[in-house]
Regions:
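Conserved catalytic core of the tyrosine transesterase superfamily
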Residues: 1-196
């Protein structure tokens, strides 16, 4: 798994004023990847109607065709609103991908490879080390878990069927899990009246 980026590095990547409609799109994609922890494939398959901007949520079809609803942060919502203003300049009404949230410069649904290449370009322009879309997902998971300590919520947001996947993903160690267990499970607590 890729390393999680620290918050300062994420900020250096995302805090820029886009120059032109392609950079407006790229910023919206990067903000969404980090804000919601989406998989690259999930971003590629998003349609406009999958985002509810007022409610700040996104409906995602994940692995195994499972649907989930994930929150979207304010900065990502603003970047998406900015993109939607420019999106119509690329939209091709004759294309089967006319409902796609993110379009390439030919008006078709953007590919995973295009997103990877555009993210590499954003990093190069800012003098940042190579950052890939999965690193943004990994950073999302790590930062939310560090702040909340809620492994189950992170599991839901990431769309993991098995919590063990989330544990590996966020590099939780057994010692941390043991502390949570010891403090939360009634039969694990020391000094209860049932102890002998």
């Amino acid at each position: 798994l890729p390393k999680a980026m620290d918050a300062d590095l994420v900020q250096r990547l995302l805090d820029f004023k886009p120059n032109g409609l392609i950079e407006v799109r790229d910023k919206a994609i990067a903000e969404l990847l980090y804000s919601s922890g989406l998989r690259l494939s999930e971003v590629c398959t998003l349609d406009v109607q999958d985002l509810e901007l007022k409610e700040r949520v996104c409906r995602v079809t994940g692995k195994g065709n499972k649907m989930r609803v994930v929150p979207v942060g304010k900065k990502a919502i603003q970047a998406i609103r900015d993109w939607l203003i420019h999106r119509k300049e690329l939209k091709n009404s004759k294309s089967s991908s006319s409902e796609a949230m993110f379009l390439n410069n030919k008006g078709k649904r953007i590919s995973a490879r295009s997103i990877q290449l555009r993210l590499e370009k954003l990093c190069a322009q800012r003098g940042l080390p190579g950052i890939n879309p999965h690193m943004l997902r990994h950073s999302f998971a790590s930062h939310v878990l560090e702040s909340s300590g809620d492994l189950r919520a992170v599991q839901e947001m990431l769309g993991h069927a098995d919590i063990a996947t989330t544990q590996i993903y966020t590099k939780l160690d057994f010692q941390h899990l043991s502390k949570v267990y010891d403090s939360a499970h009634p039969r694990a607590r020391k000094g209860t009246k049932n102890d002998n």
